[in-house]
Amino acid sequence: MERNVILAKNAGFCFGVKRAVDEAIKYQKEFGKKIYTLGPLIHNNDVVNYLEDNDIFAIELSDADSLKKGDVVLIRSHGVKESVIKDLTDKGLIVKNATCPYVTNIQLKVKKCYEQGYKIIIVGDENHPEVIGINGWCNDSAIITNGKTELENIPAKVCVVSQTTEKKETWNKVLNEIVRASKEIVAFNTICSATDVRQKSVQELSKEADLVFVIGGKNSSNTTKLYEICKKECPKSYHIENVKELDESLLEDESVKTIGITAGASTPDWIINEVISKIKEL
């Protein structure tokens, strides 16, 4: 049966993720030895395995004590607390920073406003490494909200920023709450422009498609948000990590004429292409 397969615009690697992967490979070749990243460089198991094959290994911050002077540590695109960079440098480690420039921009805004006496509010997931890192630039004092519960005791003077992969509707909801409660507000919509474009693109795609596959790591925040957006418009939306998770029985439904494909910011082209090729084979 002939089907129309549509790939969403801007699917796959974003600028910050591609930059981090390229930097990791470059530094491994430059130093000619194992290098280490604080946490998985990106939230995609297939890419993490590829990096390990190239002597690039993820470690937790607690493991840094076991590293030797002169070992190379790469800060991933999510960024880290300001204190972490100093601690690693003080240990005699060679620290290379691949924090996404958009995240660095948030960190510096937060630091400046915190020093000016603003209470920082971060719209995002309190357990996400990007948010944990940003919070470290205001002495871990931020109020962090995912928009699912109303904020209480909002201070009169606040600075509001967002996790780069947050949904626009969540940002708007939280900001409306704050506007009603605070007298002095500095708000920076720090949702990455690529994230915004990607989310709008999949919203349109899922309206058009009968079935949607969202490709990306199950631990990827931005992929999960894309899946949530798709599911609202197209009930037959499925989050898969790679072609191995493609449920072929879903393609036996004769009512499915148009299949939409999108992918998170941590999903490389080769994984996307494998899924598309498999669908076209069936």
UniProtKB/Swiss-Prot annotation:
* Recorded metabolic or biological pathway in which this protein acts: Isoprenoid biosynthesis; dimethylallyl diphosphate biosynthesis; dimethylallyl diphosphate from (2E)-4-hydroxy-3-methylbutenyl diphosphate: step 1/1; Isoprenoid biosynthesis; isopentenyl diphosphate biosynthesis via DXP pathway; isopentenyl diphosphate from 1-deoxy-D-xylulose 5-phosphate: step 6/6
User: Belongs to which family?
Assistant: Belongs to the IspH family.
Q: Which residues bind isopentenyl diphosphate?
A: 43, 78, 128, 220-222, 266
Q: Can you name the source organism?
A: Clostridium perfringens (strain ATCC 13124 / DSM 756 / JCM 1290 / NCIMB 6125 / NCTC 8237 / Type A)
| Record-listed E.C. numbers | 1.17.7.4
One MF term from GO for this chain?
4-hydroxy-3-methylbut-2-enyl diphosphate reductase activity
Q: What is the recorded function of this protein according to its Swiss-Prot or TrEMBL entry?
A: Catalyzes the conversion of 1-hydroxy-2-methyl-2-(E)-butenyl 4-diphosphate (HMBPP) into a mixture of isopentenyl diphosphate (IPP) and dimethylallyl diphosphate (DMAPP). Acts in the terminal step of the DOXP/MEP pathway for isoprenoid precursor biosynthesis.
Question: Which BP terms in the Gene Ontology apply to this protein?
Answer: dimethylallyl diphosphate biosynthetic process; isopentenyl diphosphate biosynthetic process, methylerythritol 4-phosphate pathway; terpenoid biosynthetic process
Chain positions recorded as [4Fe-4S] cluster binding sites: 14, 100, 192
* Keywords per UniProt: 4Fe-4S, Iron, Iron-sulfur, Isoprene biosynthesis, Metal-binding, Oxidoreductase
Q: Which gene encodes it?
A: ispH
InterPro entries the UniProt entry points to: LytB/IspH
- Binding of dimethylallyl diphosphate occurs at 43, 78, 128, 220-222, 266
Q: What protein name does the entry list?
A: 4-hydroxy-3-methylbut-2-enyl diphosphate reductase
Gene3D superfamilies hit by this protein: 3.40.50.11270, 4-hydroxy-3-methylbut-2-enyl diphosphate reductase, catalytic domain (3.40.1010.20)
